[in-house]
């Protein structure tokens, strides 16, 4: 009888496409469905999803007519307690929280995690039930009317989401593309600036929506148009688009002031600009075939230096900060800024070599990415 020996194999690793199954490391997976590598070792089941805002972002729920269309959501960002979203030509906001205790279908005081961002009275949505309320504290909604608008009262478990409906911010962002955005605070108020590649960049502080067009009464100077990338850096707002080599910036602490005498200006690089990202007190300028970095504090000492003139970024929506570095999609795969600075365009700088076969199949329409920090994950989504 043959001797049988036990061997402990640690299950870890991820998808490996550049090796055949016989030469892959022991414990690596050949096929995973709804599983992911765990930062604690081995594999874990991918968590399910839950709606953050219960109502769909559409004309019916926004009170608009033929404005949102049926295409994809173009923006999803959080500002304070609000979710800011865009679809079609409409920009809107909503707020959500969750129950912190079980509730029966008849209670009229609802205990939640936080009521910040909610009006002092209004309408809530939980499951398929509509609830109105007349008051609130920091963690409760009071005077609730259950089963409003002919909906059916229901009981809810702890952690179930409860949200407002959508409130329209603007409906005139014609022909908008997918948005880039930056959060900033120049004057003691948290704001978000958004750019869609077709309309003027705009800012929003939770209450006031302003076009950054340099117009009389809200700003000055000649504002950039059809901006695709926007980023706040050193108390200036920076604007760029892929059809131009020009990087425009506002006056300090004034995102809608484009007057050179007040400190606004522009910088030209030798390549079409794809995207922007601030990292370690420097502004990285990702171009089609090169990458530059801007340092300094104002127009008096801004300096632009090349990171590489031999390789660029394919899509602005691939740029993310993770693990103390910037990652972006280059022609030869996913790269880090640190690796690119160190060894320029050498192929060894790619971090996606083991899945290059999958990277080569990427379609660059509707590409986007996100970082899941608690899992140390960079996720790239593409059709």
Per-range role (PLM):
Residues 1-94, 166-170, 219-292, 377, ...:
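N-terminal beta-propeller domains
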Residues 94-108, 113-179:
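Small/polar beta-strand repeat architecture
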Residues 77-78, 84-85, 104, 117-118, ...:
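Residue-level signal for WD-repeat beta-propeller blades
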Residues 180-216:
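Hydrophobic or amphipathic alpha-helical targeting/insertion segments
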Residues 172-178, 216-220, 225, 309-314, ...:
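Short coil/turn segments at the loop-to-beta-strand junctions that recur within blades
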Residues 86, 90-93, 166-167, 201-214, ...:
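Surface-exposed loop/turn elements that mediate protein-protein interactions on large endomembrane-trafficking
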Residues 235-236, 270-383:
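Beta-sheet-dominated scaffold domains
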Residues 80-81, 88-89, 189, 197-198, ...:
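Surface-exposed loop/turn positions within WD40 beta-propeller blades
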């Amino acid at each position: 009888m043959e001797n049988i020996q036990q061997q402990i194999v640690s299950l870890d690793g991820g998808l490996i496409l550049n090796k055949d199954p016989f030469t892959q490391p022991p414990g690596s997976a050949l096929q995973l469905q709804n599983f992911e590598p765990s930062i604690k070792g081995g594999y874990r089941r991918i968590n399910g999803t839950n709606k953050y805002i219960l109502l769909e972002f559409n004309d019916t729920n926004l009170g608009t007519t033929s404005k949102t269309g049926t295409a994809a959501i173009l923006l999803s960002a959080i500002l304070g307690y609000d979710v800011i979203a865009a679809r079609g030509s409409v920009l809107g906001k909503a707020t959500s929280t969750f129950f912190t205790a079980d509730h029966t279908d008849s209670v009229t005081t609802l205990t939640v995690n936080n009521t910040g961002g909610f009006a002092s009275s209004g309408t809530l949505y939980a499951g398929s039930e509509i609830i109105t309320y007349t008051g609130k504290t920091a963690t409760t909604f009071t005077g609730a009317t259950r089963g409003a608008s002919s909906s059916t009262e229901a009981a809810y478990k702890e952690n179930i989401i409860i949200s407002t409906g959508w409130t329209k911010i603007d409906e005139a962002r014609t022909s908008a593309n997918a948005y880039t955005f930056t959060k900033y605070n120049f004057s003691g108020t948290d704001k978000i600036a958004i750019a869609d590649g077709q309309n003027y960049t705009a800012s929003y502080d939770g209450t006031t929506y302003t076009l950054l067009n340099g117009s009389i009464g809200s700003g000055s100077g000649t504002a950039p148009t059809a901006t695709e990338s926007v980023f706040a850096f050193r108390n200036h707002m920076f604007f760029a688009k892929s059809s131009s080599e020009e990087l425009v910036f506002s006056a300090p602490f004034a995102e809608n002031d484009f007057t050179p005498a007040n400190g606004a200006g522009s910088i030209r690089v030798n390549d079409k600009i794809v995207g922007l990202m601030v990292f370690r007190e420097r502004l990285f300028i990702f171009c089609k075939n090169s990458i530059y970095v801007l340092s300094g504090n104002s127009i008096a000492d801004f300096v632009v230096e090349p990171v590489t003139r031999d390789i660029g970024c394919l899509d602005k929506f691939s740029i993310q900060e993770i693990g103390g570095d910037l990652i972006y999609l280059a022609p030869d795969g996913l790269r880090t800024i640190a690796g690119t600075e160190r060894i320029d365009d050498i192929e060894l700088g790619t971090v996606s070599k083991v899945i290059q076969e999958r990277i080569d199949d990427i379609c660059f329409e509707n590409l986007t990415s996100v970082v899941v920090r608690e899992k140390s994950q960079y996720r790239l989504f593409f059709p």
